[in-house]
Amino acid sequence: MRSDIGRLSKYLIERKKNLGLTWEDVSRKLGKSPVYCAMLFYGYAQADDEEVKAVAELLNLEEKELAELKDAPYREPQQPVPPTDPFVYRLYEVVILYGPALKDVAHEMFGDGIMSAIDMSVELEKVEQEGAERMVLTFNGKWLKYRKF
């Protein structure tokens, strides 16, 4: 478990681990994607009453212990820049390496704008290809055109 996350996040992640739960288990209980559930536990998403109730039931906790989950999160990066964790660094490297080409192709397809990171979903799947496990990471974000004024 990471040492640079908040008190509640540490508690929730440790509790999940001690109960032998996976992110898929949490996902089924909350009715949200595994990535969203991990974001919630890590303090990057804001829970509604229904989600707090589901987390409390899943982790055998009192809802009042989870009241902080209903607060708007302070979405400060929890990794140094550049990241030092190998997995997170590789994602950073992908953006640095492919970013300019992706931007150019996206602008040809959609026009001048950006992909929303707010109106966006992230999906992660495991596939088998040529006898090897592969990871498919999908960002599905609304295209926001720059406005002229």
From Swiss-Prot:
<dbReference type="GO" id="GO:0009439">
    <property type="term" value="P:cyanate metabolic process"/>
</dbReference>
<dbReference type="GO" id="GO:0008824">
    <property type="term" value="F:cyanate hydratase activity"/>
</dbReference>
<feature type="active site">
    <location>
        <position position="90"/>
    </location>
</feature>
<dbReference type="Pfam" id="PF02560">
    <property type="entry name" value="Cyanate_lyase"/>
</dbReference>
<keyword id="KW-0456">Lyase</keyword>
<dbReference type="GO" id="GO:0003677">
    <property type="term" value="F:DNA binding"/>
</dbReference>
<dbReference type="InterPro" id="IPR010982">
    <property type="entry name" value="Lambda_DNA-bd_dom_sf"/>
</dbReference>
<dbReference type="Pfam" id="PF01381">
    <property type="entry name" value="HTH_3"/>
</dbReference>
<protein>
    <recommendedName>
        <fullName>Cyanate hydratase</fullName>
        <ecNumber>4.2.1.104</ecNumber>
    </recommendedName>
</protein>
<dbReference type="InterPro" id="IPR008076">
    <property type="entry name" value="Cyanase"/>
</dbReference>
<comment type="similarity">
    <text>Belongs to the cyanase family.</text>
</comment>
<feature type="active site">
    <location>
        <position position="93"/>
    </location>
</feature>
<dbReference type="InterPro" id="IPR001387">
    <property type="entry name" value="Cro/C1-type_HTH"/>
</dbReference>
<comment type="function">
    <text>Catalyzes the reaction of cyanate with bicarbonate to produce ammonia and carbon dioxide.</text>
</comment>
<dbReference type="InterPro" id="IPR003712">
    <property type="entry name" value="Cyanate_lyase_C"/>
</dbReference>
<feature type="active site">
    <location>
        <position position="116"/>
    </location>
</feature>
<dbReference type="InterPro" id="IPR036581">
    <property type="entry name" value="Cyanate_lyase_C_sf"/>
</dbReference>
